[in-house]
Amino acid sequence: MLERIKDSFTESIQTKIDAAEALPESIEKAAEMMVQCLLGGKKILACGNGGSAGDAQHFSAELLNRYEIERPPLPAIALSTDTSTITAIANDYSYDEIFSKQIFALGQPGDILLAISTSGNSGNIIKAMEAALSRDMTIVALTGKDGGAMAGLMSAGDVEIRVPSNVTARIQEVHLLVIHCLCDNIDRTLFPQDEA
């Protein structure tokens, strides 16, 4: 078991090294899009399932509260937090619509959808992206593996941040790091700090 634990650390480190080569430009572009969205008085909606739901909530909490610097709250909503809404939609319609119906109600042109799926194939995330596109929203997608069906929904104005791994746990670990990079870039751009 000790070797397996050590291997997990080694694999995680290697995946992050690979991601450090592949992802910085797309992370920077996504952060710039989010900054412009927020400067325009718009908001960011975030969604995911399971661990990715946790990531969506983590991102929203960092924006609504703070990341590492004191600053005003920023508008972000995790669509996975309202159990009454989610269970009503899943019961009355379908689980695939739990995020899309919220986007039709809350999403506005100029808002951003942060869509998170390690496989890129989650049905309710795909429906959420379709709803966002119909509302003239921009999409930032956090994916892994081959990007799945989500990759096919991306337009020129959207950004896919695809972790170079086929292992769900490694993808999730990098997704968290990407979220922290996004939050850091948003904060440092909107609220520059004296680095001295």
Curated annotation (Swiss-Prot):
Gene3D superfamilies per record: Glucose-6-phosphate isomerase like protein, domain 1
Reported cofactor(s): Zn(2+)
Record keywords: Carbohydrate metabolism, Cytoplasm, Isomerase, Metal-binding, Zinc
Catalyzed reactions: 2 D-sedoheptulose 7-phosphate = D-glycero-alpha-D-manno-heptose 7-phosphate + D-glycero-beta-D-manno-heptose 7-phosphate
Domain of life of the source: Bacteria
Chief subcellular location: cytoplasm
Entry-linked InterPro entries: GmhA/DiaA, Phosphoheptose_Isoase, SIS_dom, SIS_dom_sf, SIS_GmhA/DiaA_subfam
Domain SIS: 34-196
Signal peptide limits: none
UniProt subcellular location: Cytoplasm
Residues reported in the UniProt entry to bind Zn(2+): 58, 62, 172, 180
Record-listed substrate binding positions: 49-51, 62, 91-92, 117-119, 122, 172
Membrane-crossing residue ranges in chain numbering: none
Cofactor-binding details, from the entry: Binds 1 zinc ion per subunit.
EC numbers for this chain: 5.3.1.28
Additional detail: The reaction produces a racemic mixture of D-glycero-alpha-D-manno-heptose 7-phosphate and D-glycero-beta-D-manno-heptose 7-phosphate.
Protein name: Phosphoheptose isomerase
Organism whose genome encodes this protein: Shewanella denitrificans (strain OS217 / ATCC BAA-1090 / DSM 15013)
